[in-house]
Amino acid sequence: MTTRVGINGFGRIGRNFFRAALEQGADIEVVAVNDLTDNKTLAHLLKYDSITGRFQGEVSYDDEGIIVDGKHIKVLAPRNPADLPWGDLGVEVVVESTGFFTDGEKAKAHLEGGAKKVVISAPAKNVDGTFVMGVNEADYDNATMNIVSNASCTTNCLAPLAKVLEENFGIERGIMTTIHSYTGDQRVLDAPHSDLRRARAAALNMIPTKTGAAQAVALVLPALEGKFDGLAVRVPTPTGSLTDLTFIAKNEVSVEAVKAAVKAAAEGELKGVLKYTEDPIVSTDIVGDPHTSIFDATETKVIGNLVKVLSWYDNEWGYSNALVRLTALIGSKLA
């Protein structure tokens, strides 16, 4: 049965989620969008995208919403999620992608509005579970979990790879760096920001900053609790990021063994999530790739039991595809 979905926040992730759901042919119907932006602008930004290109379909708008390939999608504009008529619209699952309701205590307002489930498209606190597809989605329990998080784009890249490495070689401890494209949280030109590094011009600087992705891996892989730390370096690209993980394995390993383990997982249990490549790729080559983790095999380095691996990810498109898969999974469990 098709899951009826509402999107709260039709920004970068909200629009990419919408596109990805159509491209995947997911058993999802987006029936409503809540956003404070006017319908004309929402339709325009869906139709034309500087990264993903022009929408391959017909997009228009009217006073009540946007129209995509002849299907009308209602646009709402309440600021408080509790005021949204999700129940009246038959919305079953809400994708919370505003970035403002990353606390389950606030996101539960969607349930008060009549939705059955909420999926937060960001790391979140006070939720019933955090999930990374390919890693721990089997732990989802429809009976007890109403508000869940899809983690972050970086955690979605790191966790599948860490799962393979932990299961095959054991991880004593590790440090990761995400070389991450700039995001809307940064400043286009130097301007005030609570993070003084993010206050600097995003397209002109490499910007060291924080990430919670390393610690968040333990939310989906409890065996790695307390074993990871990390940081981010924001770089002047609009999308396409790279996770650099250095870890100490429990025993000595070889480059060949690491590559073989990841390749086997990418062709087996993690197919569609983890991708293996030996091509000499650069960041633009993975833009538009739906995998959440693209292992760059030829950059694997080993000294004894000290290992360095690299994995690429399209921090918008790859993440949005994972968000679609998690939403579809949750919808499939509804009675």
Question: What is each stretch, according to the model?
Answer:
Residues 1-199, 301, 325, 332-334:
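N-terminal Rossmann-like NAD(P) cofactor-binding subdomain of oxidoreductases
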Residues 3, 26, 172, 204, ...:
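Structural beta-strand/beta-sheet cores of well-ordered domains, especially the beta-sheet scaffolds
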Residues 18, 108, 159-166, 177, ...:
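Predominant activation on well-ordered alpha-helical scaffold segments within soluble catalytic domains
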Residues 66, 131-133, 147, 189, ...:
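Short clusters of hydrophobic/aromatic residues that line enzyme substrate/ligand-binding pockets
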Residues 144-145, 201-203, 240-244, 306-308:
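Short, solvent-exposed beta-strand edge segments and adjacent coil->beta transition regions
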Residues 151-152, 206-208, 248, 313:
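Hydrophobic alpha-helical scaffolding
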Residues 167-238:
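Acidic, glycine-rich segments within the central catalytic cores of soluble metabolic enzymes
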Residues 230, 242, 246-335:
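C-terminal active-site/capping subdomain that shapes the small-molecule cofactor and substrate pocket
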